[in-house]
Amino acid sequence: MQYQLLINGALVNGEGERQSVYNPATGEVILEIAEASPKQVDAAVLAADNAFTAWGQTTPKVRAECLLELADSIKQNALQLAKLESQNCGKPLHCVINDEIPAIIDVFRFFAGAARCLNGLAAGEYLEGYTSMIRRDPVGVVASIAPWNYPLMMAAWKLAPALAAGNCVVIKPSEITPLTALKLAALAKDIFPPGVINVLFGRGQTVGDALTGHEKVRMVSLTGSIATGEHILRHTAPAIKRTHMELGGKAPVIVFNDADLDAVAQGIRTFGFYNAGQDCTAACRIYAQRGIYDTLVEKLGQAVSSLKMGAPEDESTELGPLSSQAHLARVTAAVEEAKALSHIRVIAGGRQTGGKGYYFAPTLLADAKQEDAIVQREVFGPVVSITAFDDEEQVLRWANESRYGLASSVWTQDVGRAHRLSARLQYGCTWVNTHFMLVSEMPHGGQKQSGYGKDMSLYGLEDYTLVRHIMIKH
């Protein structure tokens, strides 16, 4: 099993404190890995800074070829990567193989193509005797912090646009789920020039702070919690570093009386519980119009109760464990707080399953009120709440009364209503009669406390560039 760090083109052992990496399906230790030492963090950033001189000047064709080669290598090693991701995260293996690995490969391939299509604006004479040009140039060294819910996919989302734009990257995966990022380091080692990609391991307070605060780091990209985002913004503020933040969500799912309720129930069964609900776009905050509320609660209860929990390697498993013992405790506390409210009805789940591993039963909580914490705070687990609403204006107000602004969906057969709400919902993405669908060509990112900046799409590529004006006198 690959457990070494990638620094300046070489795989090396960490020199810091050893940390245990767990299998969440069993609670057992997979292995121990040594963190990067402060000296190794410094070496990785300096390697990236040195490599940037040449990499930032390479042609888009060369960068694209490297990204395509890495995509091919991921495809060739797909089963090994999927098994590592499943073992370290508790994801059902078939979901990683069939859903996540193809999407990861596509992200690298998309940005390989996009790298060759990034242009500045046309030249022009805006002052007599002078010609102006607009360039889009790479930022420099990017420190990327990836989360524990989709370790390999988020590594791809961080690496691909940054590298395509000509930046060099030092990436730190979560210390909870580092195995696929470390394997990716081994695959990338002989494809990219030394220092272009560096992969470290360690906790935020020991490695993350040293990395994001390093004077040579020009940009920090984070996918994580609001609290982590706030910390990094405070930590990097004195140096005025560029930042790119994706900080979670609490997606409203608005279901009107005319919606196809069978499609809604089956959709939420998937969109609310994929990856054990550990997804910032999960369909977790349901608003159902009063005329269909009771029917939808019944249909959702049946759908949620039918989800099969089990071992990640079992092909029939739909729901795996949560990522860690600490996160299991957080999800349990959030549900217990909701259950203590007299108006909340537990339709399904609402408890840990017991036994080995960090499993929490798929949960549906009915009759939640707008002010309840279960409606307002991200749980990040297999937990969905449902609230009744009366009319369009009320539900629009409730949906937007949230500190989050990442994803939302509207379920209706009324095209005019779909357009009206889509235009007024304060979310980075709004789906109509579906949820959770992502493609490499379209941007993903939030507003409000869900952060700023885009992943994927040409907008994501532009976020890793600087706009520069060149003026020539003639």
From Swiss-Prot:
GO MF terms held by the record: aminobutyraldehyde dehydrogenase (NAD+) activity; NAD binding
Active site (UniProt): E246, C280 (nucleophile)
Keywords, in A-Z order: NAD, Oxidoreductase
Misc remark: 4-aminobutanal can spontaneously cyclize to 1-pyrroline, and 5-aminopentanal to 1-piperideine.
Family label: Belongs to the aldehyde dehydrogenase family. Gamma-aminobutyraldehyde dehydrogenase subfamily.
NCBIfam families in the cross-refs: ABALDH (TIGR03374), PRK13473.1 (NF010000)
Class of enzymatic activity (EC top level): oxidoreductase
Naturally occurring in which organism (per UniProt): Salmonella arizonae (strain ATCC BAA-731 / CDC346-86 / RSK2980)
Known partners and oligomeric status: Homotetramer.
Positions bound to NAD(+): A146, P147, W148, K172, P173, S174, E175, D209, S225, I226, A227, T228, C280
Pathway(s) where this gene product acts: Amine and polyamine degradation; putrescine degradation; 4-aminobutanoate from 4-aminobutanal: step 1/1; Amino-acid degradation
Reported function: Catalyzes the oxidation 4-aminobutanal (gamma-aminobutyraldehyde) to 4-aminobutanoate (gamma-aminobutyrate or GABA). This is the second step in one of two pathways for putrescine degradation, where putrescine is converted into 4-aminobutanoate via 4-aminobutanal. Also functions as a 5-aminopentanal dehydrogenase in a a L-lysine degradation pathway to succinate that proceeds via cadaverine, glutarate and L-2-hydroxyglutarate.
UniProt name for this protein: Gamma-aminobutyraldehyde dehydrogenase
Matching PROSITE patterns: ALDEHYDE_DEHYDR_GLU (PS00687)
EC number(s) per entry: 1.2.1.19, 1.2.1.-
An annotated GO BP: putrescine catabolic process
Disulfides per UniProt: none
Reactions performed catalytically: 4-aminobutanal + NAD(+) + H2O = 4-aminobutanoate + NADH + 2 H(+); 5-aminopentanal + NAD(+) + H2O = 5-aminopentanoate + NADH + 2 H(+)
